[in-house]
């Protein structure tokens, strides 16, 4: 088995019972693949597939002028490389994007030859089409300097859907069936039955009309309509009665209204008897062709065709007329013998279309189309052209209507056609097929669709959403171009004169900046980033709304299995509408979610893996991943638990066709990180999944001792860690950069064989948490491609580490852990276990005001030198300064308006030239309740404005860092080149050279070492080929130097050019403060099983319960939090964590007594290979075993994968191994070694019962009491009511509401109440009075009229009611 460089350092012991058949796919693949398909940036213009940008262009171009003599054609598009890289965009507040240029061709035809087109002239040109934001390698976008994510949308797939109203519309509870044709874009077409069984249609949810109007509009006559939906009964009229052509099936189940006889007159069915199968057999045996029927059998039937008098050509009766006595009389008079009527019955052949034709008042195609026009455009006169144009535009025009590839495939599948391709507009037979199926449904044949089935909902990813916006922009451009194309020839215009890119840019900008699906990235920790990018939302444009979404849409559907996680979804109004992709889920070409299965043939599981969509899956019998199989892959059990079309059942192995690939297949990333998930209640698992995303990265991340094995995948795929692009040797490492000399076989010829990784140091995330990368390699380490070189936030040796492993005791402790409160030892705080760093960004801008420019300066009047002590000469705070609330960070003054001066002030000013009062101090200060250390300052200056010293210094530092990188690359390049050169030169014969090298001398190593490297190139070689090689190496080094100088100049130019700032802004300063947050009472914490709580008290270490060996617990939790919540997983985690730590202590003890390496190897083999997945420790060298052991001292990390975790028996084995009997006895353990005797820290007495004790991975969540604590003495007041504002952000007061007033009234505390409602709130005069009284030392309250009462009086007056106060 292959272990990567980092995996070898610390192997996670897995308890999985099943081998890995299918690796977890790259977790951000959906986002990255979708966007690369959209751009197709690396594909040459001519070879691009018709999708993404290419599809948008080809759908709008060519644009033809109104007169048809000029057209604009699209040739290809190209994307330029972005001006700034991702980091620069984030610092400068820019969008990371690329300019899109399209090559278009203007073709002008000759007007002189209207018959056949003759090209007069062709102009081709590249036109700028706006900026397209680019995706970062981690699947996000940088928009205006902040990282955003475009969430995928789950929407109803285009196609045709049949449903009924579940009997809710009509009071009788009758099922009303309906059908809806949904295109990708264009008008929706609905068909619906009303309670009277008449079929209507409506377009775009407008007024409904009988469906036969639509059928006539597409060109069918009433006869054709009836022929399409009914079978006919044929009658031959006799002088009395008639002969009916006998069709046995149509008579079954009916009641005979007369005696039915055979040819000889023998009665087979008596009158009023129901016709059954025996009667039909008798009639068939008698070879009956016709049945004689009496006259009244014909009455009430409906004619299927127009009946025309052969002689006169007069229509005697029309199709769909009822047969009456008078009609029969007319028919006999005209000598008509044969007539056809519609065959209907009450059971499975209703007269719906016939009834609808009766309601329909239109007569022909034109009338029908006019009726549709009137419905769509009420009040407009229906001219012939307008009517035709509107009808064709509705469903037949490619510009206005697009069913899309998916829609056509779904439509054809639903109506039972074999081919899945076809035209993208609606065809006449599509409409007919839909109505036929709907009528059949009403007749009781077939099934309605389930709209929550994942075969009927598809995912729209970033690429598709962006393409739709881009197309919308292009369509706006198209309108403008059409107008101008007519003048193209006369005014001699070029393509760039025709195309204005503004509409495209604004459409794209609006989408990425403010669409509901473009969200501010959740960056609290790596897991929250990954989850955000894998999120699937049913909300957003074209989706559902929270208020309208019912219960069914939100519920878990059987087709979610392996596609969408049934656990992870937000609590609250969005529950079930926002979901997360399952671990292995994948999108197919149509946008439907697929999940992988292993193929099973003749009850033998093969290695073939097929991805099935929800529709395909319904056709197969699928076994679960935990079905027992032998070593040959044969299914062993007599009955296997399996699923078919959403139903679970036990079947024999020979019926199984597929099998799940992994037990974790059904859950998302966050849920698969919960160990023992199978023992937790679903609601708590949901909370656990959601709370892991809120874990704040700790100062020193610590891997979970009990994990699930997915931690490494998660950390690596999130992009938080630094991975090696190419293998090689670590050449240099410090805290900020890693330099790797690439292996020869991986380096491309002629390029620098150096990879430099600049680490991210103390950077602010979107949620103000700290992103910091730490190298985990040493100089000289050999690394391969994909190895982890540096840990990021919340990762430890390349594994996700969201919290800390805490020693947890489940016991009550003086009521301090009542109701989920958490008791924590002071040692945890002292060791900085949960200390986190939060980075706050504070901005100040200097604007150009009407009264003059604002100035950033140190020269501020009325400020003491103490307050200015931390500012440099430019007025900006030093890096490293420790600041408190209220301290000045950036000094800034704003010009004040000229005030009217008193004569005395004028005199003083004239004498002293006092000018300082013209400006007011508007410096940037640290907000209330914040303190920290300044870690970075950025200064941005507008083009053409003099840079201050500080800004210049920042630029110089940046250039110095860049030069260092280039020098490193050059050093390695030259080092390699000179090594190659030395190998080549030694032993060669020289024709002369420096240091008097004689002709014909053989060059040796000593001579070269004595010579300066650059003088080697002056050696003249006898061998021409070698001389040429020497020259080539010299040229390549000089070329590299030239390239590096160019790169440096490029960087300098970027840094020294002015910054793009908003209008009116001259200078902007950003100050970054690092705030250290220690754990304190009021902080929210949680485990991974939904067991959340608030820290109630931090207890001195000596008061905590402790074990017999003196080791105190870190955390005390209430045992009552477990049984009612049913998340027993936390208890199992504690047991297994206890074993993991115990094993670590045993390894530590071996290292301390310097045990033999064989003993160590044997012990590790026992741990890793006694049960669960086997590890290949044989391949480790002794040094590697030793390093592994050192890393295991803090606990052997375990992996217990979801639904395939450690059993009770395995946990028992591990506990026995970790705590041999002598240690167990000393600690007072119970026989199963999962409970321990504890002693009270305050009294030293032993607790009555043993306590469950062990290690749990515990997280600190992003709800910190520091962000919530807030107090106000005086502050801002609301303008109208004059009451204090509310909330921390406004520095508001505490609301004393209605109920609180009742409480004081109940106590009769009238003076307290008066004070609360007047001087402490909105009695303006009273407030000032109180202040005056306090200054005088007189503690008296003069309460007046509350301002809000005056507001009330004014409001009453505004209603026209005169209200006055009588003062007495």
Curated annotation (Swiss-Prot):
DNA-dependent RNA polymerase catalyzes the transcription of DNA into RNA using the four ribonucleoside triphosphates as substrates. GO terms for cellular component: DNA-directed RNA polymerase complex. InterPro entries: DNA-dir_RNA_pol_bsu_ext_1_sf (IPR042107), DNA-dir_RNA_pol_bsu_external_1 (IPR019462), DNA-dir_RNA_pol_su2 (IPR015712), DNA-dir_RNAP_su2_dom (IPR007120), DNA-dir_RNAP_su2_hyb_sf (IPR037033), RNA_pol_bsu_bac (IPR010243), RNA_pol_bsu_CS (IPR007121), RNA_pol_bsu_protrusion (IPR007644). Pfam families: RNA_pol_Rpb2_1 (PF04563), RNA_pol_Rpb2_2 (PF04561), RNA_pol_Rpb2_3 (PF04565), RNA_pol_Rpb2_45 (PF10385), RNA_pol_Rpb2_6 (PF00562), RNA_pol_Rpb2_7 (PF04560). GO terms for biological process: DNA-templated transcription. The keyword Transmembrane does not apply. The RNAP catalytic core consists of 2 alpha, 1 beta, 1 beta' and 1 omega subunit. When a sigma factor is associated with the core the holoenzyme is formed, which can initiate transcription. Its EC number is 2.7.7.6. It is an enzyme of class 2 (transferase). It catalyses: RNA(n) + a ribonucleoside 5'-triphosphate = RNA(n+1) + diphosphate. One of its GO terms (molecular function) is DNA-directed RNA polymerase activity. It comes from Burkholderia ambifaria (strain MC40-6). The keyword DNA repair does not apply. It comes from the Bacteria. Belongs to the RNA polymerase beta chain family. The gene is rpoB. Keywords: DNA-directed RNA polymerase, Nucleotidyltransferase, Transcription, Transferase. This is DNA-directed RNA polymerase subunit beta.
């Amino acid at each position: 088995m292959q272990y990567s460089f980092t995996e070898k350092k610390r192997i996670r012991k897995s308890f999985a019972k099943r081998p890995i058949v299918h690796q977890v796919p790259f977790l951000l693949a959906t986002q990255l693949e979708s966007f690369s398909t959209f751009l197709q940036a690396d594909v040459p213009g001519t070879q691009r597939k018709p999708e993404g940008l290419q599809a948008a262009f080809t759908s709008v171009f060519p644009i033809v002028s109104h007169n048809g003599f000029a057209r604009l054609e699209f040739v290809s598009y190209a994307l330029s490389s972005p001006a700034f890289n991702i980091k620069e965009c984030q610092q400068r507040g820019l969008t990371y994007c690329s300019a899109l240029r399209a090559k278009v061709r203007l073709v002008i035809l000759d007007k002189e030859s209207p018959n056949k087109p003759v090209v007069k002239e062709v102009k081709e040109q590249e036109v700028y089409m706006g900026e397209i934001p680019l995706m970062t390698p981690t699947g996000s976008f940088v928009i205006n300097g902040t990282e955003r994510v475009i969430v995928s949308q789950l929407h109803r797939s285009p196609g045709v859907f049949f449903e009924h109203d579940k009997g809710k519309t009509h009071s009788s509870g009758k099922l009303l069936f309906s059908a809806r044709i949904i295109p990708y874009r264009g008008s929706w077409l609905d068909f619906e039955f009303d309670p009277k069984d008449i079929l209507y249609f409506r377009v775009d949810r407008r007024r409904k009309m009988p469906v036969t109007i639509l059928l006539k509009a597409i060109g069918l006559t009433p006869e054709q309509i009836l022929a399409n939906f009914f079978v006919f009964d044929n009658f031959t009229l006799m002088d009395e009665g008639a002969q009916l052509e006998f069709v046995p099936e149509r008579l079954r189940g009916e009641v005979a209204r007369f005696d039915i006889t055979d040819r000889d007159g023998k009665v087979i069915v008596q009158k009023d008897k129901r016709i059954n199968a025996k009667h039909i057999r008798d009639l068939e045996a008698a070879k009956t062709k016709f049945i004689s029927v009496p006259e009244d059998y014909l009455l009430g039937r409906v004619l299927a065709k127009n009946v025309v008098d052969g002689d006169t050509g007069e229509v005697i009766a029309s199709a769909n007329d009822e047969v009456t006595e008078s009609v029969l009389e007319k028919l006999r008079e005209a000598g008509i013998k044969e007539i056809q009527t519609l065959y209907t019955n009450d059971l499975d052949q209703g007269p719906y279309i016939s009834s609808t034709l009766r309601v329909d008042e239109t007569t022909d195609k034109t009338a029908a189309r006019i009726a549709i026009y009137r419905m769509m455009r009420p009040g407009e006169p229906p001219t012939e052209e307008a009517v035709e144009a509107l009808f064709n535009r509705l469903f037949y025009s490619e510009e206005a209507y697009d069913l899309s590839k998916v829609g056509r495939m779904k439509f054809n599948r639903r109506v039972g056609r074999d081919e899945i391709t076809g035209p993208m507009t609606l065809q006449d037979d599509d409409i007919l097929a839909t109505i036929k199926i709907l009528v059949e449904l009403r007749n009781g044949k077939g099934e309605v669709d389930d709209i929550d089935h994942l075969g009927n909902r598809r995912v729209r990813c970033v690429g598709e959403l962006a393409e739709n916006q881009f197309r919308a922009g292009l369509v706006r451009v198209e309108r403008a171009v059409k107008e101008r194309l007519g003048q193209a020839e006369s005014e001699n215009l070029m393509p760039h004169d025709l195309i204005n890119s503004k509409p495209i840019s604004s459409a794209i900008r609006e989408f990425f900046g403010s669409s509901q699906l473009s969200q501010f990235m959740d960056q609290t920790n790596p897991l929250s980033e990954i989850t955000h990018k894998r999120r699937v939302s049913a909300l957003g444009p074209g989706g559902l709304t929270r208020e309208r979404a019912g219960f069914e849409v939100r519920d878990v559907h059987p087709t979610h299995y392996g596609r969408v996680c049934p656990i992870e979804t937000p609590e609250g109004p969005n529950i079930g509408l926002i979901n997360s992709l399952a671990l292995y889920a994948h999108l197919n070409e149509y946008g439907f979610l697929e999940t992988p299965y292993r193929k099973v043939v003749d009850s033998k599981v093969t290695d073939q893996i097929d991805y099935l969509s929800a529709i395909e899956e319904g056709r197969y019998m699928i076994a679960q991943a935990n079905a027992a199989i032998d070593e040959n892959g044969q299914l062993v059990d007599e009955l296997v638990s399996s699923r078919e079309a959403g139903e679970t059942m036990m079947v024999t192995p020979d019926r199984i066709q597929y099998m799940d690939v992994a037990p974790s297949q059904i859950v998302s990333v966050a849920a698969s990180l919960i160990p023992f998930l199978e023992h937790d209640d679903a609601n708590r698992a949901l909370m656990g999944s959601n709370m892991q995303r809120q874990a704040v990265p700790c100062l020193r991340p610590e891997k979970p001792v009990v994990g699930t094995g997915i931690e490494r995948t998660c950390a690596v795929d999130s992009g938080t860690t630094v991975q090696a692009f190419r293998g090689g040797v670590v050449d240099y490492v410090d805290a900020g950069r890693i330099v790797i000399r690439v292996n020869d076989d991986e380096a491309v010829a002629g390029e620098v064989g150096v990879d430099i990784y600049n680490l991210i140091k103390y950077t602010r995330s979107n949620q103000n948490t700290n992103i910091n990368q730490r190298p985990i390699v040493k100089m000289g380490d050999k690394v391969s491609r994909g190895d982890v070189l540096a840990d990021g936030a919340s990762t430890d040796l390349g594994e996700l580490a969201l919290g800390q492993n805490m020693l947890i005791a489940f016991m009550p402790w003086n009521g301090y852990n009542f109701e989920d409160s958490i008791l924590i030892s002071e040692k945890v705080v002292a060791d900085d276990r949960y200390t986190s760093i939060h980075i706050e960004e504070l901005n100040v801008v200097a604007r150009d005001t009407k009264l003059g420019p604002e100035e950033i300066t140190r020269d501020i009047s009325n400020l003491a030198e103490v307050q200015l002590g931390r500012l440099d000469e430019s007025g900006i705070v030093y890096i490293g300064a420790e600041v408190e609330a209220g301290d000045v960070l950036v000094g800034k003054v704003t010009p004040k308006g000229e005030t009217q001066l008193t004569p005395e002030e004028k005199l003083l000013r004239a004498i002293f030239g006092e000018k300082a009062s013209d400006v007011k101090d508007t410096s940037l200060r640290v907000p209330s309740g914040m303190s920290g250390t300044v870690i970075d300052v950025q200064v941005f200056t507008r083009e053409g404005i003099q840079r201050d010293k500080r800004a210049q210094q920042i630029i110089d530092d940046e250039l110095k860092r860049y030069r260092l990188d280039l020098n490193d690359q050059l050093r390695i390049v030259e080092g390699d080149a000179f090594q190659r050169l030395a190998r080549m030169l030694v032993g060669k014969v020289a024709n002369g050279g420096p240091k008097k090298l004689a002709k014909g001398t053989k060059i040796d190593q000593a001579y070269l070492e004595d010579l300066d490297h650059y003088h080697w190139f002056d050696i003249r070689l006898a061998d021409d080929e070698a001389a040429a090689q020497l020259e080539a190496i010299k040229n390549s080094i000089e070329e590299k130097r030239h390239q590096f100088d160019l790169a440096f100049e490029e960087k300098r130019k970027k840094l020294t050019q002015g910054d793009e700032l908003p209008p009116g802004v001259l200078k902007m300063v950003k100050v970054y403060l690092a705030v250290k947050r220690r754990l304190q009472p009021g902080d929210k914490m949680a485990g991974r099983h939904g067991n959340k709580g608030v820290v109630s008290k931090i207890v001195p270490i000596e008061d905590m319960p402790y074990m017999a060996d003196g080791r105190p617990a870190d955390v005390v939790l209430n045992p009552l939090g477990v049984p009612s919540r049913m998340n027993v997983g936390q208890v199992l985690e504690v047991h297994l964590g206890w074993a993991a730590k115990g094993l670590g202590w045993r390894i530590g003890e071996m290292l301390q007594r310097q045990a033999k390496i064989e003993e160590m190897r044997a012990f590790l083999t026992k741990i890793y290979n006694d049960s669960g997945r086997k590890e290949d420790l044989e391949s480790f060298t002794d040094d590697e075993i030793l390093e592994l052991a050192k890393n295991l001292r803090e606990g052997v990390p375990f992996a217990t994968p979801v639904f395939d975790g450690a059993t009770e028996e395995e946990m028992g084995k591990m506990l026995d191994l970790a705590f041999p009997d002598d240690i167990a006895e000393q600690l007072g353990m119970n026989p199963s070694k999962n409970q321990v005797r504890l002693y009270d820290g305050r009294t030293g007495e032993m607790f009555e019962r043993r306590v469950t004790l062990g290690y749990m991975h515990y997280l600190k969540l992003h709800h910190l009491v520091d962000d919530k604590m807030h107090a106000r003495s005086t502050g801002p007041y609301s303008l109208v009511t004059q009451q204090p504002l509310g909330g921390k952000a406004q520095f508001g007061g505490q609301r004393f509401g209605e109920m609180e007033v009742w409480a004081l009234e109940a106590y009769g505390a009238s003076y307290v109440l008066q004070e609360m409602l007047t001087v402490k709130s909105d009695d303006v005069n009273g407030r000032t009075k109180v202040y005056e009284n306090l200054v005088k030392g007189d503690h008296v309250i003069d309460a007046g009229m509350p301002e809000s009462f005056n507001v009330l009086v004014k409001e009453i007056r505004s209603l026209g009611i005169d209200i006055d106060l009588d003062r007495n």
